[in-house]
UniProtKB/Swiss-Prot annotation:
Name this protein carries in UniProt: Endolytic peptidoglycan transglycosylase RlpA
HAMAP family (alphabetical): RlpA (MF_02071)
Alphabetical list of InterPro entries matching this protein: RlpA, RlpA-like_DPBB, RlpA-like_sf, RplA, SPOR-like_dom, SPOR-like_sf
Domain of life: Bacteria
Pfam families the record matches: DPBB_1, SPOR
Family label: Belongs to the RlpA family.
Covalently attached lipid (N-palmitoyl cysteine), positions: C18
Main EC class the enzyme belongs to: lyase
The encoding gene: rlpA
Keyword Lyase: yes
Low complexity: bias regions: 262-276
Lipidation (S-diacylglycerol cysteine): C18
One GO CC term on file: plasma membrane
Length: 362
C-alpha cells in the first residue's frame, strides 16, 4: 500500500512539473511600451490613415512548404533584416490587396504584417526613415524580410544588400497613430492646399488658392541631386525623410557660389510694404540666378502648371515645371542667391504652411 501511494505521489509530481513547464512555454511576456529617449524626429512618406483590413489577404497561408501566420498585434512586432526592391513595371501585376502594383508609390510587401497597414522603415546604414504602406505579400527567398517599392528604396537610398528596421504604425479609427513606429517620431502631414491669404486690404475680398487634388506624390530623393559629384549628404531634412533637420535655406549638396550681382537702385513707384511681405527678386531681376525653391511634385503636368501659376501669382515670383521620371516638379525662381530663396521659403511656411527646399536650376 505504501508503494502504491509513493507511485501516486511521483506521478502527481511529474504531472505538476509538466504543467508548469508547459505553462512557462506558453507565457509570452508583454513588451515594454516604446519609450523615447531622444529627440522627436519628423518623417514623411505614405500618409497613415485608417483602412479596414482586406478580407482575403489576411489569412494564414503556406508557401513552398513553409507556414506563415499573419501578425494579429502589430504593437508587439519589430523586425530587422535585409530589404529587397520591387523591379516590376507599373500595371504588370496585382498586389495581394487587389491594387495594381505601382513602383512610384511608397509601398512595401511583407510576409505576415496586416494588409493594408503602415510601418516606419529605417535604413540602418544611413539613418533615413520613411513611412510605407504594406499592400502586398512577400518576399520569399534570399533571406529578405521586406520588399520595398522603387520609390521607397530611392527615398531610403537602399540597395539589395541594405539592412533595414521595420516598426509598425497602428492607425485607430479616429486617425490617431501609435505603435513601435511612433517612438521618437511624428509623421508629417503632406498637403499642398493653400489657405486663404490674410486680408490686408482693410475688408476687401480676397480669393483663396487651392492646391492640386488627387495623386500628389512625395518629393523624391532624386530631386535633391546637386551638380556636386559627391552627391548630397544623408543627413537631409525631416520633411524629406531623414532623422536630422537642416537650417533654413541650406541646400542639400554643395553648389558653386554664383558671381555677386550688381546692385541697381531705381525710384520706387509702388507703395511701401512691411518687411515681412518683401517679395524676393526673381527671374526678371536676376536672370543669371540658379537657385530654385521646390514646393512639391505631382503626377499630372497640367495640374503642376496650374499650381505653379497659382503660387506665382500669390507670392509674386516666377517659376517653372520640370519633369522627373513619372512626376512633375513645381519650382519657384530662379534667385540670385540662397538668401533670396530662403526669404521665399519663410513666406511659404508662414503664409501657406508649405514645406519646401532649395535646389539649383538644371
Amino acid at each position: 500500500m505504501r508503494k502504491q501511494w509513493l507511485g501516486i505521489c511521483i506521478a502527481a509530481g511529474m504531472l505538476a512539473a509538466c504543467t508548469s513547464d508547459d505553462g512557462q512555454q506558453q507565457t509570452v511576456s508583454v513588451p515594454q511600451p516604446a519609450v523615447c529617449n531622444g529627440p522627436i524626429v519628423e518623417i514623411s512618406g505614405a500618409d497613415p490613415r485608417f483602412e479596414p483590413l482586406n478580407a482575403t489577404a489576411n489569412q494564414d497561408y503556406q508557401r513552398d512548404g513553409k507556414s506563415y501566420k499573419i501578425v494579429q498585434d502589430p504593437s508587439r512586432f519589430i523586425q530587422a533584416g535585409l530589404a529587397a526592391i520591387y523591379d516590376a513595371e507599373p500595371g504588370s501585376n496585382l498586389t495581394a490587396s487587389g491594387e495594381a502594383f505601382d513602383p512610384t508609390q511608397l509601398t512595401a510587401a511583407h510576409p505576415t504584417l496586416p494588409i493594408p497597414s503602415y510601418a516606419r522603415i529605417t535604413n540602418l546604414a544611413n539613418g533615413r526613415m520613411i513611412v510605407v504602406r504594406i499592400n502586398d505579400r512577400g518576399p520569399y527567398g534570399n533571406d529578405r524580410v521586406i520588399s520595398l517599392s522603387r520609390a521607397a528604396a530611392d527615398r531610403l537610398n537602399t540597395s539589395n544588400n541594405t539592412k533595414v528596421r521595420i516598426d509598425p504604425i497602428i492607425v485607430a479609427q479616429d486617425g490617431s497613430l501609435s505603435g513601435p513606429g511612433m517612438a521618437c517620431t511624428t509623421v508629417a502631414k503632406q498637403t499642398y492646399a493653400l489657405p486663404a491669404p490674410p486680408d490686408l486690404s482693410g475688408g476687401a475680398g480676397t480669393s483663396s488658392v487651392s492646391g492640386p487634388q488627387g495623386d500628389i506624390l512625395p518629393v523624391s530623393n532624386s530631386t535633391l541631386k546637386s551638380e556636386d559629384p559627391t552627391g548630397a549628404p544623408v543627413t537631409s531634412s525631416g520633411f524629406l525623410g531623414a532623422p536630422t533637420t537642416l537650417a533654413p535655406g541650406v541646400l542639400e549638396g554643395s553648389e558653386p557660389t554664383p558671381a555677386p550681382q550688381p546692385v541697381v537702385t531705381a525710384p520706387s513707384t509702388t507703395p511701401a510694404t512691411s518687411p515681412a511681405m518683401v517679395t524676393p527678386q526673381a527671374a526678371s531681376q536676376s536672370a543669371s540666378g540658379n537657385f530654385m525653391v521646390q514646393v512639391g511634385a505631382v503626377s499630372d503636368q497640367a495640374r503642376a502648371q496650374q499650381y505653379q501659376q497659382q503660387l506665382g501669382q500669390k507670392f509674386g515670383v516666377p517659376g517653372r515645371v520640370t519633369q522627373n521620371g513619372a512626376v512633375w516638379r513645381i519650382q519657384l525662381g530662379p534667385f540670385a542667391n540662397k538668401a533670396e530663396a530662403s526669404t521665399l521659403q519663410q513666406r511659404l511656411q508662414t503664409e501657406a504652411q508649405l514645406q519646401s527646399f532649395i535646389t539649383t536650376a538644371q
